[in-house]
Every structure is written in C-alpha cells, then in structure tokens.
Amino acid sequence: MYELTGDQKWLPLAEKYTEDLDSVQYLTWHHDVGFMIGSSYLNGYRFAGKEEYKPVIIQTAKSLSTRFRPAAGVLQSWDADKGWQAERGWKCPVIIDNMMNLELLFEASKLSGDSTFYNIARKHADTTMANHFREDNSCYHVVDYDPETGEVRKRQTAQGYADESARARGQAWA
C-alpha cells in the first residue's frame, strides 16, 4: 500500500509485519524464502531506505543459495524426501514459481558485492528458459532434474489441471 499510495501511515504497519519475518532469513528447506523476504525486507530497503534490512537480505540469499544444484544449474524448489513431494519420485523438483526468487539474489549481489548470488540467479534463469517452456511458450509447473547429471527426468504439474496444461499463476511468474 505504501508503494502504491506513498502515504506514510502505511510505513509502521509494513515495518511491523516485515520484522515479524526475521527468522525466515535462515530457512534452507524450501525456496519460498526469496519471495517472502523480497516482498518485505527488500521492499523496505528500497522504499524506506532501511539500512538495517541489508543483512537480512544478504543472509536470505545465502540460505537460498544452499538450494542451488550446480550440475543441474537450478535452485531446487522442494525437498524431495519428505511429505507429498516424496510420493512423486522426484529428485530435484524445480517449479516455475522459483523465478520469483531471482530478484532477491540479484539485489543481494549488488548489496554484498558477492557475484555468487548473481551467478546462481543467472544460471537458474538460463536453465529454466531452456527446460521449462513448451513450443507454444507456455511453461511446465515442475521440472524434475537429476541433481548429479543435470538431466531432465520429468515435466509435470503439482497444482495445475494436467502435466501438459498451462497453469495461470506459473505463467504470470514466468
């Protein structure tokens, strides 16, 4: 709301709800940390100049980077050995939603001077472009990779109508 209106009344609320997410910066078991912190701390840093948010952004990039699988060139979205994801037989599932994390990695690279974050984001984007899109430019929800060889194992959906259907939310993020 603050970005949209510029009305200062929104700042205290934005800061309160942002700072409630402080512990998220240390999570390494899923990819959502990038957009959770990007939509909160990164926006707080950009719009309100909150210098104290910089370390949180950088730490989140470090945590997210632990999900990078170099042989496949992607950030693994979900752990494949727990919950419903384990039932799918995936090894390194990557969802198109993961593209939302790249902004945080690019910004963390600028803020920290560490090009590792930039390189991970760029490689993930390039790999996604090569493997997530169909001839008609619609995208798969999930592409499962072999984390050791980088080969694509499966192209599926976890939330869409069918494996070969376009998922509106994923298309928007792509």
Q: What spans do the regions from the language model cover?
A:
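Glycan-recognition and catalytic cores of secretory/periplasmic carbohydrate-active enzymes
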Residues: 1-173
